[in-house]
């Protein structure tokens, strides 16, 4: 059990017969009336985000979540196949279980979340950044613009994003998995 003073981003709670993680919270002390906490909760079962207000001091049941690191092996018609790095146990997931499947490539590690009491699968979390290779992009011309211009690029997983003009084919770039946006070019040792 936890109270609203224990709220923090990422805390998993049981609420309305579902598991939620706190995405955002704000303690509010109005001039009139009691204090309360405004929250944004993300369902771990279906991914929907809801807004909810808790009165200050309310007791909430926290959910125990177990994180295990799995390695992505391959994708086929049955879904995505992952392997636990410690026990070598394999886990088969459908495409809906992974938030942005085009951000993962073979051999990449990701965290898989399980409910500790029941052992049920909850979801997958990608690392904050991934590095992917650009397979195709139009050549950018120097001096084409005075401002920061972007062009489309196709990555090795099939994902298409906007990249700066100086990015060429076969370069490796870093992508933010939360915003699915270009971050920087990865320096490669030659």
Curated annotation (Swiss-Prot):
Subcellular location: Cytoplasm
GO biological processes: peptide biosynthetic process
Annotated SMART domains: EFP, Elong-fact-P_C
CDD domains per record: S1_EF-P_repeat_1, S1_EF-P_repeat_2
Pfam families: EFP, EFP_N, Elong-fact-P_C
Recorded GO CC terms: cytoplasm
Protein name per Swiss-Prot or TrEMBL: Elongation factor P
Organism of this sequence: Amoebophilus asiaticus (strain 5a2)
């Amino acid at each position: 059990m936890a109270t609203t003073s224990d709220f923090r981003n990422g805390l998993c709670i049981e609420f309305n017969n579902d598991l939620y993680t706190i995405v955002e919270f704000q303690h509010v002390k109005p001039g009139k009336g009691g204090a309360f906490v405004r929250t944004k909760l993300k369902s771990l079962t279906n991914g929907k985000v809801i807004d909810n207000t808790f009165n200050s001091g309310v007791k909430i049941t926290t959910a125990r979540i177990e994180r295990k690191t799995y390695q992505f092996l391959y994708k086929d018609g049955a879904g995505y196949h992952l392997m636990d790095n410690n026990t070598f146990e394999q886990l088969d997931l459908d495409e809906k279980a992974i938030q942005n499947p085009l951000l993962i490539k073979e051999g990449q590690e990701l965290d898989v979340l399980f409910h500790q009491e029941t052992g049920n699968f909850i979801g997958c979390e990608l690392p904050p950044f991934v590095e992917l290779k650009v397979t195709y992009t139009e050549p950018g011309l120097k001096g084409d613009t005075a401002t920061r211009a972007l062009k489309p690029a196709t990555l090795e997983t099939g994902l298409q994003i906007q990249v700066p003009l100086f990015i060429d084919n076969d370069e490796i770039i870093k992508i933010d998995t939360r915003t699915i946006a270009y971050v920087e070019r990865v320096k490669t040792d030659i």
